[in-house]
Amino acid sequence: MDQDIEPMKFSVLIAVYAKETPAHLAQSLESIFHQELPPDEVVLVEDGPLTAELDAVVSRFKEAHEELHIVRLPQNQGLGLALKEGLTHCHYDIVARMDSDDISKPQRFSREMTWLETHPETDVVGCWTDEFADESGKVISTRRLPENHEALLPFSRYRNPMNHPTVMFRKAAVERAGSYRHRELFEDYDLWVRMLQQGARFHNLQESLLMFRLSPQLYSRRGGRHYIRQEIAFQCWMHKVGHINGLRLVANITVRTLIRLLPEGMRKYGYLFFLRRQ
């Protein structure tokens, strides 16, 4: 970024709930406040009451960083509604997302802001993620996504086009599409589809700028009848609004349902092979 030009101010939006691990939240917040391009404000949504240990982490960072603003929801509402509320408290048009257990690399905000400043036609920019599963931080895989809008639009008809915790977006474009809403398990994908239908443009930087924590429950959560029901409902909605045609609907549901029904040990490989390829 040109040192002679003052970058646009921006917010970071993050949500946390009672089941988060306090040490993971602390690592996430540390990575936010130690960026090459630090945020002008961080909006942390407490999605329902937190544990005493999580409260202690939040209080420690609040004392150290006056730019940290806390939004407390009296009851857990789920990620979509928590982010919807949090976005209304973001004062700047550029907003970076962050999850409460991931780690942003120091150059992430700088790289994404540079892209948005030099490409005013882009509404959402993201990047790849390096995935890790334990405290050693050893990378076990990289989640790569297509780069430009022309590739991401068709890609979005069968795969989520963005790594949600990596994105930086223009708040006005998100609000034009109706902002976040409750769509269990698919809050971000749902928003991207609505934005695409509004004409928003997307881009992925072709580098990993975030460490994505793979929880031990990742693949167990992505199976079972409840997940299948949510998956089918989301795919049917994409068909209803015209984002996918009937053949794509059948193909998407068939592949995803088969993978969700696999035993947990096999589901990991089905997920990586079918649902993670570019």
Feature map (PLM): residue ranges:
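Acidic donor-binding loop at a coil-to-helix junction in glycosyltransferase catalytic cores
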Residues: 185-191
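A conserved acidic beta->alpha catalytic loop
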Residues: 46-56, 75, 99
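Catalytic core of nucleotide-sugar-dependent glycosyltransferases
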Residues: 200, 212, 220-244
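Conserved donor NDP-sugar-binding/catalytic core segment of glycosyltransferases
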Residues: 107-139
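Glycine-rich, basic loop-to-helix element that forms the pyrophosphate-binding segment
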Residues: 73-90, 111
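Short, well-formed alpha-helical segments that are part of the catalytic scaffolds
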Residues: 19-34
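Catalytic beta-strand/loop signature of glycosyltransferases that borders the donor
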Residues: 128, 202-209
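Short aromatic/hydrophobic "clamp" motif used to bind/position activated sugar donors
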Residues: 95
